[in-house]
Amino acid sequence: KQLGYKIQFIFDESDNISNPSSKQTLSVLSCFRRCKYKLLTTGTSTRNNISEFAPQLELLYNNSINMISWCRTLYSYDKRSADMEHKENPYYGMPIPAYKKGYRLFANSHLPEKITVFGVGQRNQDIYNADELDRLLGKTVITRTFEEVTGKDIRRIHQMPIPFLPEEREVYNIVLKEFYRIQREYYSSTGNSRKDALMRLIQQITLLLRISAAPDCMKEYEGETPLKEMAVVEALARWPEEVVAIGVRHTAVLDPYAAAIREYLPERPLFVVTGSTVTFAKRRALREVLRGSRNGILLCTQQSLPSSVNFEFVNKIIIPEMHYNNAGMSQFYMRFVRYTSTEKKDLYFPIYIGSLESNLMQMVLAKEKLTMFMKGQDADMDEIYAKFGVDYDLLSTLMTRETDDEGHLRI
């Protein structure tokens, strides 16, 4: 206020204000929305849904005549019947309102429902009023892709579809059909029965995805080394002279992979890195140690690698445990895909077919379609499938959520 808002504001990683309810978003908006000169930079303006872009628009335009709602029709889903409803836009020709009212209007104008692991197979993820959104993006967003800047496309994505072994399917079915029996072994009660009931499905989904990453992280598993871990070990054995990076999301999944690599490839140097066990300074020093190993294996949690350290000499990356969107995973694998890279980078996604992981992959692809649209690259799902190396019928492997005779949700 003392400067009359005559300041220049540059905001890197502006997608950090994608959550309109967070204190960070509210603080940034209250401090800088009236600044005269603003530049927002980010690798991806949205991660999960289009409405995440609304706070960034609000920061740029401050709900002025530069962000007018030109969508004549608003869309929403009826929660009971799941039917699409539409109505006239009461704010047509007016600036989009501030805060929650504006975020709701923005979502209902373009994508009225979030993409979920079950919704990907039930509803298409088309963008409504796409021309109006494209017109707004056209005057707001300037996009330069990695390929445009470097003049080369060095990323190659490979899918590794893997079937369940009987013992792996057995532990998967325990969580699927008898979750009530083992729930308290993995999740503590909140002390509130209503909250416990609301959390049950989320906890079940989380555990199913954990099993899909490493079945032997469950004590109910009674088989040998799971097939996915063996597929990763066999891939490592095919690259005896390569430095390889493996990224998971949870330490509970990391431990089984570390044990399998030590058992089957004891001669290969193994570097295990997590944010909680290795200091930041050691993680930065890891770069030269890994390069000097010649054929070392970096096994880490995806969020543990500091963004200031790059490993451009690593050409093989395996991701056995996926994030909920490609933006989250790219924060990890782009540590290895750099502007200075000269060799091709191979990304591998081992996936258990017929598990909830298939739904997760389809959700990642659906979100990637939205992300590409926000960057001015309107692509259909066939192009997205080709980009991610999906050459099998992914939709036929999706799991569904149903309501039983007693009104309980079941997967």
Q: What are the functions of these language-model segments?
A:
Residues 2-105, 322-327, 336-338:
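Signature of the SF2 helicase/ATPase Hel1-core->accessory helical subdomain module
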Residues 15-17, 28, 44-47, 60-62, ...:
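Short, solvent-exposed loop/turn segments at secondary-structure junctions
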Residues 18, 268-359, 367:
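Conserved RecA-like P-loop NTPase helicase motor core
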Residues 22-34, 66-217, 239-241, 364-366:
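Inter-lobe coupling linker of SF2 helicases/translocases
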Residues 49-60, 172-173, 257, 310-311:
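PAPS/PAP-binding and catalytic site of the sulfotransferase fold
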Residues 151-171, 176, 190-309, 378-411:
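Conserved Helicase C-terminal RecA-like lobe
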Residues 324-333, 337-411:
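A conserved SF2-helicase RecA2
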